[in-house]
């Protein structure tokens, strides 16, 4: 224990090599947050400062903070520290930052705090033009996520964990409004930037994006925007054309009758023989629940019937041997196949059937 206390003292040592050695050793103790809480969270304060240190030290400091941030006291200390959050924002929006992915992970943890809601409308300094031309923090992070997939913005990062960060912010009404409103700087509705990632190779990215799409679907008045084709405009804004991006992860290589296939969305017709549905059953359930939310209005139900969603869900039910997926399929099919006068409303579902925002 004395050795551990000494290591904690070394976190603010003047010698770089000693700080690095201390961080290296303390990563192995980060499964126990209590180690870093005494006295008065001083080690946590030291770690926050080390995030600005040389990359090897900063990476270890961030790894420790990621691991201990599930502790409620440490979690609140980090999320409520505006100066520290600004440090994270400054670094993650630097296209040369070597610890950008670790920062994305930490932000995804901190996004569960209501303190982080302030980032939705927070203005800050502009980053490099290659990153974003918006003065708003959330725009900048979204641009990192979109442009940085596969290391195309920062060779050290893919920003995948920002998917969880975005999903958490979409739990808030102000967050959903953000994702569904056209931004001035690029004249794009943010949710339309995310849809292309529903079939991305990164499981983290697919899962977070699916959750974000589901959460914004709670805004029933925006369903026309979500369901409209991108060649249509709703209140002067191009439609998001959300359906193909929800349905494709649910689609496998099954063949449909000529009549069924002819009425499906173009993206769902003539899929390759090696087409595989998403392998994560939780993601499948998320997409199925999004579709159920989109049946809240008669217009939504009519749209899903028109584009032959039922045959696709039928095959998903048959091919996926998972109780959660099959239950979600059943709930959706009941709505799609029911006579209109019997059609239920989402808000009238039994308590144990209610769909909730996730993350």
Language model regions located:
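Core helices of alpha-solenoid repeat scaffolds
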Residues: 1-5, 37-45, 78-86, 123-126, ...
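Alpha-solenoid HEAT/Armadillo-like helical repeat scaffolds in large eukaryotic proteins
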Residues: 6-12, 46-53, 87-92, 144-150, ...
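Alpha-helical solenoid repeat architecture
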Residues: 9-11, 15, 19-33, 46-49, ...
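Short inter-helical turns and helix N-cap capping residues of alpha-solenoid HEAT/ARM repeat scaffolds
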Residues: 14-15, 53-55, 95-96, 154-155, ...
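Alpha-solenoid ARM/HEAT helical repeat scaffolds used for protein-protein interactions
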Residues: 31-38, 71-77, 114-128, 150-153, ...
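Acidic, Ser/Thr- and Gly/Pro-rich intrinsically disordered linkers and low-complexity segments
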Residues: 136-155, 250-282, 325
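C-terminal interaction modules of eukaryotic adaptor/scaffold proteins
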Residues: 301-345
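Acidic, serine/threonine-rich intrinsically disordered low-complexity regions
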Residues: 342-359
